[in-house]
Amino acid sequence: MKPLTMLFTNNPLSDMSTQPVLYAYNLPDYTIFESPKEFDYYIGEPDNIYIVLGRSNNIEGAINCENVKKDGIITLKRPSGGESVILSPNMLIFSFKQKSDKIQNPVKLFKLINSKLIENFSKLGIENLYSKGISDLSIGEKKIMGSSMFTKNKTIFYH
């Protein structure tokens, strides 16, 4: 993993002795964003436990700062939306980027991607899988996958 870039808390009055350090998102999947290819992807597994905050989350409202600092969990902030997630070893992460002159509506794009995932997981024997909300996949009431995306410089990044 590349060296972490430190971000600062949104609360200038926060106590840094109990405040975990918030780093810019730099997990291995993000390296594909800079790839010269029109389309690129990453499939892998986290090498550690990470808490990843969505673009609009703030550290104070999203996590138990004292416990996160005590446990030494690395906290990252991704450039895409959505809520905070925990990543850990033995989880599958997949991401892709696509350059495009015409960026689709994100909701339509999530629906398209989720329908393709459901179709292909179904072929593998995974049943009762459906879209929940804008970007999640569930089996029954159990969420099994969440995703987010952002666009920058005519490039879509989905993870």
Regions found by a protein language model. Name each.
Residues 45, 53-55, 70, 87-89, ...:
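Generic structural "secondary-structure junction" signal
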Residues 46-48, 80, 89, 130-134:
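Short Gly/Ser/Thr- and Asp/Glu-enriched loop/turn motifs at secondary-structure junctions
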Residues 62-102:
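A glycine-rich, hydrophobic loop/mini-helix early in the fold
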Residues 1-66, 70, 78:
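Active-site loop/lid in soluble adenylation, ligation, and acyl-transfer enzymes
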Residues 38-39, 80, 132, 144:
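Short beta-strand-initiation
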Residues 93-159:
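Catalytic beta-strand/loop module used to bind and position nucleotide/cofactor moieties
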